[in-house]
Each structure stands twice: as structure tokens, then as C-alpha cells.
Amino acid sequence: MAKISKRMKEISAKIDAEKKYPVSEAFDILRDVSSVKFVESVDVSVALGVDPRKSDQVVRGASVLPNGTGKTVRVAVFAKGPAADAAKEAGADVVGMEDLADEVKKGNMDFDVVIASPDSMRVVGQLGQILGPKGLMPNPKVGTVTMDVAKAVRDAKAGQVRYRVDKAGIIHTTIGKVNFTSDALKQNLEQLLTDLKKAKPSVSKGIYLKKVSVSSTMGPGISVDFSDLNI
């Protein structure tokens, strides 16, 4: 059995695993137990009342967090003509078509998000085996295949997070950094949960938002009471 580090023992002593903490208190605890030399992300896990084995219960989508994620996001856009010009004006870091595809094939992928106009998918479609495993393949369900590439670029730059339910029925994503104020993190969490509720499959029965936990990059999960959130 692996030994529990002294740091983790000290952290665990401050957290009641059986308790659901008020959201702001949970964020305070994350800051209190953060002892690493970098600014940790604040991550959230949301257990949903869905059966992801069934295709009509796979929850996926995107949420634009009002206070961003605290990360600098590099965006690549596959587009041409006016759409390419609009993407550049919106702040895209890389814009192209076949030339951008060639760079991807060479392994030159210095970007975090890929957006594509519908007419560029003939080019992007050939890159599925490269972009797919990295989670970069554009998809209309999360707004990364779109006629309005400029808006997609602005959303990505503003702090859009994408999510997809895993095999256990859980959504994992980030809602900011530990140096965000509790109010900023709370607003981001509220936006995410609001968007998740909108994405509820019509066939999902019973309790949909079952459990919400927050954690820092190197910290333990803390179950939160989300009943008083504005969602």
C-alpha cells in the first residue's frame, strides 16, 4: 500500500469527507491547503444522473465562464476568405487552411483550441487521427465548427471550457485559479452548472445534478452544497 505523504495527511485532517461545504468555504479551504510553488487551477467534478452508455444521454458542450479560467488560450482557426479575416480580427493566433493542416501533420501544434468553419472540414477531416487524441478536433456540439468563427474565437479567449461526461457519468473541467476571489469562482461555477442543466437530456430521469466537488490541481476533492447557488 502506498504511503500517504505528510502533506496529504495534514490536508485530510482539515477536511470532513462526509460534509458538504458551503461553496465559499470550500474555496477558502483550497487556498489554505495550497502549498505548491505555482498557482493551482480550481477544478470541478459534477456527477450527473445519466447513463453515458446510451447515446441519447451523453452530455457534452461548452460554457463561457464570466471570469475566465486564468489561462492564456492559443486558438487556431481553419477558415478562408472573410471568415479567416474575421478570425484574425477576433484575436486568433493561427489562421489557415491547407498550410495549417501541413503544420499539424508535422506536429507543430502550439495551440489549445481548434475552430473550423463548416467549409473547412474537408481539410480538417483528414486530421482526425492527429487532433482527436489530443482533444482538439473541432465539433459542432461544442461550438468549434461554426459559421461564426469570430464569436468562437472570442469565447475561447474569454475563458470557454468544454466538457463531456465520462463513463462514470461525471463531468470534469476547470473553473479558475486558486488566486481568484471566492465570488469569481462562485460565479464561474454557477455559469457551468446553469449550462449543464440546459444540456440535460430529455430522457434523463430523477436527480440530474447529483454531486459537485471542487479541488485544486494538487489537492483533495471537497464536496460542496450547491443548493443555494443561483442556477
Swiss-Prot record:
Q: Which GO BP terms sit in this record? A: regulation of translation; translation
Superkingdom of origin organism:
Bacteria
- Give the SUPFAM superfamilies listed for this entry: Ribosomal protein L1
Which InterPro entries does the annotation name? Ribosom_uL1_bac-type, Ribosomal_uL1, Ribosomal_uL1-like, Ribosomal_uL1/biogenesis, Ribosomal_uL1_3-a/b-sand, Ribosomal_uL1_CS
- A Pfam match is Ribosomal_L1
A molecular function annotated in GO for this UniProt entry is: rRNA binding
Q: Which GO terms describe its cellular component?
A: cytosolic large ribosomal subunit
Keywords for this protein: Repressor, Ribonucleoprotein, Ribosomal protein, RNA-binding, rRNA-binding, Translation regulation, tRNA-binding
Q: Which family does it belong to?
A: Belongs to the universal ribosomal protein uL1 family.
- Annotated function: Binds directly to 23S rRNA. The L1 stalk is quite mobile in the ribosome, and is involved in E site tRNA release. Protein L1 is also a translational repressor protein, it controls the translation of the L11 operon by binding to its mRNA.
The UniProt subunit note reads as follows: Part of the 50S ribosomal subunit.
Q: What is the protein's given name?
A: Large ribosomal subunit protein uL1
Organism taxonomic ancestry: Bacteria, Pseudomonadati, Pseudomonadota, Gammaproteobacteria, Thiotrichales
Gene coding for it? rplA
